[in-house]
Amino acid sequence: MWQLLSPTALLLLVSVPGTHAEDPPKSVVILDPPWDRLLEKDSVTLKCQGAYPPRDDSTEWRWNGTLISNKASSYSITDATVGNSGEYTCKTGLSAQSDPLRLEVYKGWLLLQAPRWVVQEGESIRLRCHTWKNITIQKVQYFQNGMGKKFSHQNFEYHIPNATLKDGGSYFCRGIIKNYDLSSEPVKVTVQGSKSPSPILSFFLPWHQIIFCLVMGFLFAVDTGLYFSVRKVLRSSKEDWRNGKVTWSRDPADKGG
């Protein structure tokens, strides 16, 4: 005996996971070396990480939204100029377009570099005092919020292995280049606190799941009520039929028959 699906069953069928295609993962732009702030004449290679179809590694590169003719999985910039600054994105054959990566090229003698300007508590901070064309620099010192930190007679990278909130702030480096005392522009380093979810809040479901459960409960109650009501009527009609209690009415026009 064929039966129509109830609203609850239809809702369950529509909400079954996997009944619709999920969005492909995003491609990712990686820098080599990992500095997103450069001086003129520097070189950098942008690499696109993502899934490719078999025998097809063509990549779509964009600079400030404009398509770049390069279709290789990597894009190299040599002898960088200020004009190379901007947002770069990439897209592979089986991955969605990446989030934009901002690259900045500056004119000057000295520049502070870091692979990341935003870190979580417990992660490492790595700072580099970079000179134009890697010219020798001496008596290098790093500063945080105007206060001198580490000092060396030779150039070096400043590492903070386990960052805390107090390690965030404005940083710059200073040194001697060809008898000139030079300083880089300050850059903000952000240390974000670890977010541990509250046990009470984590117990509750997301709002859309709560609404779904409420709707499901309402439809189930309606379906159950309709089911028992129809069943009662059908059972009563069946008993009347068996007991001969069914009354047939005649059309008034048939009185003379």
From Swiss-Prot:
User: According to its UniProt record, where is this protein located?
Assistant: Cell membrane
What residue ranges lie in the Cytoplasmic compartment? 231-257
Taken from the record's topology, the Extracellular segments are 20-209
Which PROSITE patterns does UniProt cross-reference here?
IG_LIKE
Carbohydrate-modified residues: N64, N134, N162, D181
Q: How does it assemble?
A: Forms a heterooligomeric complex with ITAM-containing signaling subunits FCER1G. Interacts (via transmembrane domain) with signaling subunits; this interaction is a prerequisite for receptor complex expression on the cell surface and intracellular signal transduction. Binds the Fc region of antigen-complexed IgG.
* Known outcome of mutating K149M: In clone 334.8
Q: List the disulfide bonds.
A: C48-C90, C129-C173
**Reported effect, P186A:** In clone 334.8
| The encoding gene | FCGR3A
GO annotations under biological process?
antibody-dependent cellular cytotoxicity; cell surface receptor signaling pathway
> Domain Ig-like C2-type, which positions?
25-104, 108-190
- Offer one Pfam family short name for this entry: Ig_2
Biological role:
Receptor for the invariable Fc fragment of immunoglobulin gamma (IgG). Optimally activated upon binding of clustered antigen-IgG complexes displayed on cell surfaces, triggers lysis of antibody-coated cells, a process known as antibody-dependent cellular cytotoxicity (ADCC). Does not bind free monomeric IgG, thus avoiding inappropriate effector cell activation in the absence of antigenic trigger. Mediates IgG effector functions on natural killer (NK) cells.
Q: What is this protein called?
A: Low affinity immunoglobulin gamma Fc region receptor III-A
Membrane topology term: Single-pass membrane protein
Which terms are listed as keywords in the entry? Answer: Cell membrane, Disulfide bond, Glycoprotein, IgG-binding protein, Immunoglobulin domain, Membrane, Receptor, Repeat, Signal, Transmembrane, Transmembrane helix
* GO cellular component annotations of the record: external side of plasma membrane
